[in-house]
Amino acid sequence: MYEFWKELHNAPYHFPMDESIWYESMNYDVDSDGRELFTEIDTEDTGHAMVQYGYSAFGFDENGEISPEIHYPIIRDLAFAPAYRTEAEALLKKVLEYFKGEPRIYAFFHYFGMSACGRHGKLHDNDRHIAQLLERHGFVVEHENVYYMRQLKDTDTTDGRVTLQWRERTAGDCREFAAVLDGLEIGWGQVHFLPQGDIAYLRWIFIDSQRQHSGLGTAVMKQLCQELYHMGIRRFDTDTALSNTAAQGYYEKTGFVNAGITRSYYSK
């Protein structure tokens, strides 16, 4: 199924990976802190269409905190060539029957994407035929993000004003950092180091509000990109909400390329 999966997945976050990395990420994935993502997960295919679905191992309470008492029914992946919609629809109907009785079913839940794909769980706008099939069965858009990608090069330079202090790597291969200027922390972030070895994903970044619009945010990103390059990273991606135009401007100013819109869905 590995070769079949590669044929059907060509979004910017479907990075090259060998079969062992793919298998681990498909079946035994964890989040940034090493928590298993799913209590149960099944994958089915017809030879022309595939679906992966199951129950999450945890969810998020009303305060946004992780709760092991909450379990979401999730269609993690649905993929097919446009000519095989009938086969894909049969798979989708089977999944909907499996989740029958659930008040809400999620599809392409961002947090529960594959680690080998930066855990970007949303569906790319290029796969409009998949979105149309979901919509045909009562799914609506939950959230929209802009996806960004950046190639790191040895020509990425910094003026040396900002230094980064890295924390230990988590069980989920993430490292947080603090950006320091004149002995004071002025920014923070978290980077996910993907199992491929030369790809990293920026999970989040924040610059002290009193330091914004001073050029220091750009200096922090330049320092980050330079250090990641020297760690062996060549591809550095991230995303932000479609509504967050300030973050979009920041990423585009610091060399990231807009690679399209991605969406998550839920059933009404």
Annotate each PLM feature.
Residues 45-47, 143-144, 187, 260:
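A structural microfeature
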Residues 67-69, 73-86, 205-213:
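A short, internal acetyl-CoA/4′-phosphopantetheine-binding micro-motif in the GNAT/acyltransferase core
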Residues 123-151, 239, 257-268:
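Conserved catalytic-core motifs of GNAT/GCN5-like acyltransferases
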Residues 83-98, 207, 213-227, 249-253:
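Conserved acetyl-CoA-binding loop-helix of GNAT-fold acetyltransferases
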Residues 12-36, 48-66, 173-175, 180-181, ...:
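A conserved beta-strand-loop-helix scaffold within acyl/acetyltransferase catalytic domains
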Residues 105-128, 238-247, 264-268:
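Conserved beta-strand-loop-alpha-helix junction that forms the acyl-donor binding cleft
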Residues 101-103, 234, 257:
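Short acidic/polar active-site loop segments enriched in Thr and Asp
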